[in-house]
Amino acid sequence: MDAPPPPGAGTPAGAPRGRSPLARFVLTVILWLPVTFVVWYLVSPALMWVVKLVAAVAVMPFGDLVRTVEQTGSTLQFVTSLKPGQAAGAGVVSVSVDGLLYSFGMPMFAALTLSAREQARWKLLVIGIAALVPFVTFGVIADFLKNVAITAGPLVASQAGFSAPQREMIAFAYQFGTLIMPTVVPAVVWVVTHRAFLERMRGATRTPSA
């Protein structure tokens, strides 16, 4: 008769004996979340600086609609060529977007990555955060476009020059970038970068056959 496997065999690294590896992982994620959210909040100006650079390139197809993209802390300001009124010299419209609203998936990804305790976790963390930057930029730009094309009023919206179908697309992009991408995309990126960990977790939690 074959000898039984040693206790804890097949469990992911760091999983304690006598406790479900999945339960331990979930608990570790919960413990990491406050830490990663605090760090994310503190370093958000640096993260938004990267988003600002990407956004400045991404708005180029809109021509002279956006004159420049500026930053104050974690808030990005899109300085446009649109006039707030009909009077000459009345200034231009500037739209502020809070980048924190679209980047809170980053600390979630960090908590999952650090809880998995993979040997290359710091490399995976950097890769994952970098992969999330374009999606954060998408949400920020969709918010900006929603403001100038829909919520800014007919005078400003008419200057922006978007058609009715384009405004519908902007509204959809805004909803998608606000409700779906900040939570779903980090989870997808984590799954893609941690397939080996998930395979080990599945093997460790599989019920042995009789």
Regions found by a protein language model. Give the residues of each.
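Hydrophobic N-terminal alpha-helices or hydrophobic patches in metabolic proteins across all domains
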Residues: 2-210
